[in-house]
């Protein structure tokens, strides 16, 4: 589901990837989170690539529309860590 959503944001003719941000778990960053524009990623089988950084899908916490504030995806917090 997550990979399909990201592919849709990247490739659907009515979608503008620069309008979306991916927030992901990055230990050591402020609040253990970093964000990147969907416009700046390359999607792979089980991870995203941003510059030289590989981000596994399981580290994606949220996908958000920057224009509307709509949250398209939010990882379920099952262990109280997020």
From Swiss-Prot:
- What Pfam families does UniProt report for this protein, alphabetically? MJ1316 (PF04457)
InterPro entries recorded for this chain?
Answer: MJ1316 (IPR040459), UPF0248 (IPR007547)
Q: Which family does it belong to?
A: Belongs to the UPF0248 family.
**What is the designated name of this protein?**
UPF0248 protein Mevan_1298
Organism for this UniProt entry: Methanococcus vannielii (strain ATCC 35089 / DSM 1224 / JCM 13029 / OCM 148 / SB)
């Amino acid at each position: 589901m997550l990979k399909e959503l990201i592919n849709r944001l990247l490739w659907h003719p009515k979608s503008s990837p620069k309008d979306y941000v991916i927030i992901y778990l990055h230990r050591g960053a402020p609040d253990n989170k970093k964000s990147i524009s969907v416009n700046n990623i390359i999607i792979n089988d089980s991870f995203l690539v941003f510059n030289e950084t590989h981000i596994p899908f399981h580290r994606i916490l949220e996908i958000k529309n920057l224009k509307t504030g709509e949250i398209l995806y939010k990882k379920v917090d099952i262990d109280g860590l997020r």
